[in-house]
Swiss-Prot record:
Protein name in the entry: Spindle pole body-associated protein cut12
Job description of the protein: Required for bipolar spindle formation. May act as a regulator of the p34cdc2/cyclin B kinase. Required for full activation of the plo1 kinase. However, in cut12.1 cells at restrictive temperature the H1 kinase does rise concomitant with entry into mitosis, indicating that cut12 is not required for activation of p34cdc2/cyclin B. The cut12.s11 allele may promote cdc2-independent phosphorylation of SPB proteins thereby overcoming the requirement for cdc25 in cell cycle progression.
One GO molecular-function entry: signaling adaptor activity
Keyword tags: Cell cycle, Cell division, Coiled coil, Cytoplasm, Cytoskeleton, Mitosis
Recorded coiled-coil stretches: 261-312, 522-548
Comp. bias intervals (Basic and acidic residues): 140-151, 161-182
Entry keyword DNA-binding: no
Gene that this polypeptide is encoded by: cut12
Main location: cytoplasm
Localization, UniProt: Cytoplasm, Cytoskeleton, Microtubule organizing center, Spindle pole body
Subunit text: Self-associates. Interacts with plo1.
Organism for this UniProt entry: Schizosaccharomyces pombe (strain 972 / ATCC 24843) (Fission yeast)
Region (Interaction with plo1): 122-325
Segments of this protein annotated with the region Disordered: 123-182, 344-369, 510-548
């Protein structure tokens, strides 16, 4: 490992810097230190400028072994060189004072190239107040040097210090006119340490210099403040007197206040947008509720009208056929067929049934409780189709957008109840026993006074007991219109003595087929139709989107 460097302390470097700047730079030291020690009162020449010579000497270069010199952490070529720092002296001769762009202590001179260099009125106040040193009189050099500092910085030495120097001169103490400092650093530090007068002198100068620097800084701050106030008149909110904190959020001053004001304004705008959207949704829901309520009222009125119509029809038929054989509205043609004249028929038919087999229907007074009657679930299917068409029209409104489904309302509950129920509140025209015996709801008859058309066959007759009169009338009518149909009817009729009731196919209408279906089957068919309509609607929407 290499030896540690003998580094001087910090205060030694500061003292050396000030001493070399104010008093001059020492010459290159040599080995014989005692030969350069001079008397303080001897008239010696001023120290010359030190010449920069970086060549190492034998005394300054330490003797080290090759192992230390060839270390890994050593830079090759730097062990034989000692780097030094030289400070030049401020005291110059006449040639140096007139040298252009020469830096002196805390001030600069103008260049000789400036045409206004020779005029005193164009010089700076610092240069005008600075007198030139008297070069011809070397005894007054230090005095002129001190006067130069005093005049430049308005330095007044304390009266106590002056009186002390005068008293020392009266007592016969030797006051050196010229101060010479030894060339070594240790001797220089010891000289400053033991010379109290010199220390007081330079300490007072340093204090005054620092005081002037502080005053200049204060003046500079005031100037900057005045400039800022002048420039901030156009922007009164950014002046220096106003505080930077925010009291009112509506008029923020700080950056954080402006930031939070922007955030709160964004929240307010979002809140207002949400309120507008909520009001629009409420209006749409109210309109939908009104539409559904109108639909409910419409179907209620329709049901009431049908009930009243049924009641009036039933009461009118009872008053018309009172005291006679009861014939309903559907069986008017049956009565005419019974009363028609018979015609001869070649085929063997079953004899006419006795009067006891044909039961006379009992008259029934409409009961007050109107909760039993024929099946009217077809109204539920009509309601479903009506509501599906209406929802289809509402779903395709361009301004409102596509509505997926309506909420469960009173109308939907009414429709479900109608679909699940088997009977609606309509009056019963006759008893259940008579209905079972006659089975009149499965009959269908021609409308023109009992006469059949040419296309009608016996297969289209309802399942009922056929009398000879009925068969004769049918054969006579068929013979007049189309003779081929007569043979077809003869062939279709079974003539067996064992069978009393001929098997004839029933011609049922669409309404009768609808009544014969179960409620679950009707509900399933309605659901299928709804799904089919929805599928077609989706396809149309997709086509519209592709075209757009």
């Amino acid at each position: 490992m290499s030896e540690t460097l003998n580094t001087p302390p910090t205060y030694a470097w500061v003292l050396k810097a000030f001493s070399s700047k104010l008093a001059g730079t020492v010459t290159k030291p040599v080995t014989k230190m005692s030969s350069y020690i001079e008397d303080a009162e001897s008239d010696a020449e001023l120290p010359q400028d030190a010449k920069e010579d970086l060549r190492p000497t034998e005394t300054l270069t330490p003797l080290k072994s090759k192992a230390a010199q060839n270390g890994i952490l050593k830079t090759p070529g730097t062990l034989q060189i000692k780097k030094t720092v030289n400070f030049k002296d401020i005291s110059k001769d006449a040639a140096t004072w007139n040298r252009p762009t020469k830096n002196n202590f805390l001030f600069t001179r103008l260049d000789d190239e400036n045409p206004l260099m020779g005029h005193e009125e164009f010089k700076s106040p610092l240069l005008q107040s600075t007198p030139k040193p008297n070069i011809n009189n070397p005894d007054n050099e230090n005095k002129s040097k001190h006067d130069e500092f005093d005049n430049r910085y308005n330095i007044n030495i304390n009266e106590s210090y002056k009186n002390e120097t005068k008293s020392n001169q009266r007592l016969g103490e030797d006051v050196p006119s010229k101060k010479k400092y030894p060339h070594s650093m240790d001797a220089e530090i010891s000289k400053f340490k033991w010379d109290s007068n010199n220390n007081n002198d330079w300490s007072s100068l340093m204090k005054d210099c620092f005081r002037d620097v502080v005053n200049n800084n204060r003046k500079m701050k005031e100037i900057i403040k005045d400039v800022m106030i002048d420039t901030s008149q156009a922007f009164p909110s950014e002046s220096l007197d106003e505080p930077d904190y925010t009291i009112n959020l509506d008029a923020p001053r700080s950056s954080s206040g402006k930031y939070w004001k922007q955030k709160f304004s964004m929240l307010d705008s979002a809140h207002s947008d949400l309120e507008l959207e909520l009001t629009s949704i409420r209006e749409r829901l109210e309109s939908l509720i009104l539409e559904k309520q109108e639909e409910i009222n419409f179907w209620k009125q329709r049901c009431r009208a049908l009930e009243t119509e049924k009641i009036h029809n039933h009461q009118g038929q009872q008053s018309k056929y009172k005291g006679k054989e009861f014939v309903g509205n559907r069986f008017s043609q049956m009565r005419e067929l019974y009363t028609a004249k018979p015609s001869p028929i070649t085929t063997k038919v079953v004899s006419r049934p006795s009067q006891s087999d044909v039961r006379e229907p009992q008259e029934q007074v409409p009961s007050k409780n109107l909760h039993r009657g024929a099946d009217m679930s077809h109204l539920a299917a009509q309601m479903l189709t009506h509501s599906s068409k209406k929802s289809h029209t509402t779903n395709l409104i361009p301004s409102e957008g596509i509505i997926s489904s309506t909420p469960i309302s009173a109308a939907s509950k009414v429709r479900m109840n109608l679909m699940q129920s088997n009977q609606t509140p309509t009056p019963a025209p006759f008893s259940i026993a008579a209905k079972k015996s006659h089975l009149p709801s499965k009959l269908s008859f021609p409308q023109d006074g009992g006469s059949l058309s040419s296309a009608t066959t016996l297969q289209q007759l309802p399942k009922a007991r056929v009398t000879p009169n009925v068969l004769s009338s049918l054969s006579s009518n068929l013979g007049k219109t189309n003779p081929t149909s007569v043979y077809q009817s003869k062939a279709n009729v079974t003539t067996s003595a064992d069978v009393e009731k001929p098997q004839v196919k029933v011609a049922t209408s669409s309404r009768v087929d609808y009544d014969l279906k179960s409620p679950n089957q009707r509900t399933a068919n309605a659901k299928k139709r709804l799904e089919e309509r929805r599928r077609r609607r989706k396809l149309k929407l997709q086509e519209l989107q592709l075209n757009s």
